[in-house]
């Protein structure tokens, strides 16, 4: 069996275990690998993907059962931080990383996303990803401060019949405060995605404490 096939089978087993642990639903795990790869492995991101170096930092917010961060870490060469505030989920992710032989290029950080943005990783990430993390405003405020200029923030989008419904979720004026600008929008046939580029350093007032973010979102 090819190494790539072995890795794929390991990922499937890990996602099955995530279901049994209550970290993923059956539907999320079913297409989890392909859905996760859709964040980066598309024609819209081909040049960005090719520019990745081993020293580059990517961060996945609220990795939970492994989507998309664990999958993307498996198929990319850069260094990944997988974040989650749950001790139990972090223990699961650490075991998964070991099973996939990713210890040298992946680290699990047990903390909230806004806490991470206030530390040493602020302004360091070339890529930040999030899936079903929170509302657009909350997710953007947690992601924006982590990005370096030129870095990308990529999210998966819920299904909508009308594309403008998704557009309204990410108002330009709200993103400007975080130094973000919409870059691309694409659909793989399985799911839709949206990327934002960091065009300016995020203001030092962000992120706010989580209770303030939720009570008074930017948009």
What do these predicted ranges mean?
Residues 114, 118-127:
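A short acidic, Gly/Pro-enriched loop at the edge of an enzyme's catalytic core
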Residues 166-219:
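SAM/dcSAM-binding transferase cores
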